[in-house]
UniProtKB/Swiss-Prot annotation:
Its EC number is 3.4.-.-. It comes from the Archaea. SUPFAM superfamilies: Metalloproteases ('zincins'), catalytic domain. Belongs to the peptidase M54 family. Zn(2+) 1 binds at residues 137, 141, 147. Its cofactor is Zn(2+). Monomer. This is Archaemetzincin. One of its GO terms (molecular function) is metallopeptidase activity. CDD domains: Peptidase_M54 (cd11375). It comes from Pyrococcus horikoshii (strain ATCC 700860 / DSM 12428 / JCM 9974 / NBRC 100139 / OT-3). PANTHER family: ARCHAEMETZINCIN (PTHR15910), ARCHAEMETZINCIN-2 (PTHR15910:SF1).
Amino acid sequence: MMGNDSYSSNRGSSRDVLSFLQNFLGGFYAKYGIEVKLVGGLSLSKFYYAFDAERNQFLARHFLPVLSYIKKDFNARAALGIVNVDIYEPGFNFIFGLAHPGLKVAVVSLYRLYPEFYGNPPDRKLLKERALKEVMHELGHVFGLGHCPNPKCVMHFSNSIIDTDIKSWMYCESCLRKLEKNLARSHV
């Protein structure tokens, strides 16, 4: 898991969020024999070409190849980048995250997960909950899961922050069975 804290705002550091995610994911994935490590900062300077000045956003797909190299460098099963910038993909105004199951990498943006983004007071607990949901969602894709029609399942597509707030941080029974099956395979 890679973090980025170079986005300057009055939102404060995301280190507590990264620590929370590392601890939670470490506990969740330990039962599948997967170790979760926080390996340091991801400099946005590597992604200057991904920035669209007209949109004031980064094209999310440009993070994935770099994460793939990091995954190889650490001989990891998967790599997750967490950034504090607004990201998008063509056809979408914004996205919370993007995964590439073939590369076994994903990126999640905290930018629109902050309650302050929506004019609400700061709430670190809510931010951590939202971040966990989006990270679990993208890692689900990394490990072979598609979107789920169950609005409470973490694999349900979030078209807005309301969708993220409605769903659970956990996989529904069907998605959890698929995840466990996929993680048991040696090639995943």
